[in-house]
Design a protein with these regions (language model features):
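Conserved S/T- and glycine-rich ATP-binding loop of Class I adenylate-forming
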Residues: 30, 90-93, 129, 178, ...
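AMP-binding/adenylate-forming
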Residues: 104-117, 128-187
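Adenylate-forming
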Residues: 185-203, 220-224
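AMP-binding/adenylate-forming catalytic core of the ANL superfamily
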Residues: 178, 289-403, 422
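Conserved helix-loop-beta element of the AMP-binding
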Residues: 128, 195-214
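Nucleotide 5′-phosphate-binding alpha/beta core
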Residues: 1-89, 94-112, 116-120, 366-374, ...
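Short helix-loop-beta connector
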Residues: 123-127
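Conserved AMP-binding/adenylate-forming
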Residues: 205, 214-310
C-alpha cells in the first residue's frame, strides 16, 4: 500500500524541483529568524539569494548537535513560542537536552511521514498497532502513534515496560503490528514463552523496528521467532522523530527517505566533502518543511550510503542503506543515546572513586545491559562492604536520573582496569561477540 501515491511516486525531476523551492524558502526563513544561521551564513559569505540550484547546497554551513546544545533551549527556534505546540528532547554529552519544537503543521507533517512509513512497511487501516516505544520526551512512542492514527489503524499505546503484560495484551487485543526496538521485540518473545504464550501463534504479522542499530541477522532472527515480517524505520529527534525513512515490504533493501521533506547528502566525515553517488559516508539531512526548528545540513553522524536505483514498490524516493556505524562515540542503549563522557562526568562528582573506568556492554535475553566498572581510590578501598555497596547504589541512581539508563555499577580495586599508552579504552562492547 502507498499512503500518498501522488507524493511518493512523483518523477525524480519533480522531487528535485520541490526540493530546490523548499531549500530556497528554508534559507530565507532561517536567515531572517534564527541569529545562529544568520551568523553562520555571513561567516561563509552566503546570502539566501545565492542558492540558485541544489548544487549550491555544498556551500551552506553544517549544523551540529553541539550547535543545538549551545543554543539551549530555544535559540534555534524559527517561530515565536506561541506557535510551538509540542516540545521533545533527547540527552546530550553536557547534560543539556537537545530540544526540538514542533508547530501544529510540524506535527501534521510528522504524522504524514510516519503514516507513509507504516504503509510502506505493509500496515493498513485494518491493523491494530501496538506501540511499545517509550512515550514522553522521547519521540518514538508518539511518532509511531501519530502515524498509525493518520493511517486509520487502531492504536494500543502501550509504551515500554511491563513486558509480560504487553504480551498478554498483545494476545487479548489481537495486535497485528508491533512498533518497538528490535531488541525489545525479541525480549517480548522470550517473556511470552515464560508465561505460555508463543507470539508466533498470535495474529501479529508485522514489526516496524528502530531507535537502535540492528543487523540483517537480527532481522531474520526476529522473523523466525515471532513469525512476522520485520521492517526497519529510521528517524532522529533533531530532524523529526521516527518516520524520516522506512524500508518497504516489497524489497527490504534500504529505507525510502521522504525527500519532499528531507534533503539527504553523504559526506566524508573527516573532510566534510560531498561524496560521489553510491559512496558510504556520513548522512547529512536538511529539513525542508519544518517550521519550529528547521535545520540546515544537520550532521547525523550515522554512516550509510544512498541508493537511487528504482524500487519495485513504485516509490521514487531515494533509499538509504542500513546504518553501519557512527562517526562519533555515542552509544545507543535500548533506544537511549548515551555518551561515555556523560557517565564520566557523573563519576568525577563522586567522592572516593578514581577517573579510571570502563563501560562493559552485554546483551542478555536480547536486551542491552551496561556495567560501569570504576576504580576506587586507594584511601577508600578498605571501606566496609556496606559502605561500598551504598556508594555503588548512589552512582547507579545518579546515572538513572541523569541519563534514563539502568546500569550495574561495580567498584573495583585500584589499578585493576588496564591502562593504555594511547587513547583510553572506555567501552568494551561484548554485544557484537555475543551475537556471533
Amino acid at each position: 500500500m502507498i499512503f500518498n501515491i501522488d507524493k511518493e511516486t512523483m518523477p525524480r525531476e519533480k522531487i528535485r524541483e520541490i526540493q530546490l523551492s523548499r531549500l530556497q524558502d528554508l534559507c530565507r526563513r532561517v536567515y531572517a529568524n534564527v541569529p545562529f544561521y544568520r551568523r553562520s551564513f555571513d561567516e561563509k559569505g552566503i546570502k539566501p539569494s545565492d542558492v540558485q540550484s541544489l548544487d549550491d547546497l555544498k556551500f551552506l554551513p553544517f549544523t551540529l548537535k553541539q550547535d543545538m546544545r549551545n543554543n539551549y533551549p530555544y535559540g534555534l527556534f524559527a517561530v515565536p513560542m506561541e506557535m510551538i505546540q509540542r516540545i521533545h528532547a533527547s540527552s546530550g554529552t553536557t547534560g543539556k537536552a537537545t530540544v526540538v519544537g514542533y508547530t501544529k503543521r510540524d506535527i501534521e507533517t510528522w504524522a504524514e511521514c510516519a503514516a507513509r512509513s507504516l504503509a510502506a512497511a505493509g500496515a493498513t487501516a485494518n491493523d491494530i498497532v501496538q506501540v511499545s516505544y517509550g512515550y514522553g520526551l522521547f519521540t518514538g512512542g508518539l511518532g509511531a502513534h501519530y502515524g498509525a492514527e493518520r493511517l486509520g489503524a487502531t492504536v494500543i499505546p502501550m509504551s515500554g515496560g511491563s513486558t509480560k503484560r504487553q504480551v498478554q495484551l498483545m494476545r487479548d487485543f489481537g495486535a497485528t503490528v508491533l512498533c518497538c526496538t528490535p531488541s525489545y521485540a525479541l525480549h517480548l518473545h522470550d517473556a511470552g514463552l515464560e508465561i505460555g504464550i508463543n507470539i508466533k501463534d498470535l495474529p501479529l504479522r508485522l514489526g516496524v523496528f528502530g531507535a537502535e542499530p540492528w543487523t540483517e541477522e537480527m532481522r531474520r532472527e526476529i522473523e523466525d521467532k515471532l513469525g512476522i515480517t520485520a521492517t526497519n524505520i529510521y528517524g532522529l529527534s533533531e530532524i523529526m522523530g521516527p518516520g524520516v525513512s522506512q524500508s518497504c515490504a516489497k524489497e527490504q533493501h534500504g529505507m525510502h527517505i521522504w525527500e519532499d521533506h528531507f534533503l539527504p547528502e553523504i559526506i566524508d566525515p573527516v573532510s566534510g566533502e560531498i561524496l560521489p553517488e553510491g559512496s558510504t559516508g556520513e548522512l547529512v539531512i536538511t529539513t525542508l518543511t519544518k517550521q519550529g526548528i528547521p535545520l540546515v545540513r544537520y550532521r547525523t553522524r550515522d554512516i550509510t550510503s544512498l541508493n537511487y536505483t528504482p524500487c519495485s514498490c513504485g516509490r521514487t524516493h531515494v533509499r538509504m542503506n542500513r546504518i553501519t556505524g557512527r562517526s562519533d562515540d555515542m552509544l545507543i542503549i535500548r533506544g537511549v543515546n548515551v555518551f561515555p563522557s556523560q557517565i564520566e562526568s557523573l563519576l568525577l562528582e563522586v567522592q572516593g572513586v578514581s577517573p579510571h573506568y570502563q563501560l562493559i556492554l552485554t546483551r542478555e535475553n536480547n536486551l542491552d545491559y551496561v556495567e560501569v566498572q570504576v576504580e576506587l581510590d586507594g584511601a577508600m578501598f578498605s571501606d566496609a562492604i556496606k559502605d561500598l555497596q551504598q556508594r555503588e547504589q548512589r552512582i547507579q541512581k545518579g546515572i538513572k536520573e541523569f541519563l534514563g539508563v539502568t546500569t550495574k555499577v561495580r567498584l573495583v580495586e585500584p589499578h585493576s582496569i588496564p591502562r593504555s599508552e594511547g587513547k583510553a579504552v572506555r567501552v568494551i562492547d561484548r554485544r557484537v561477540m555475543q551475537s556471533r
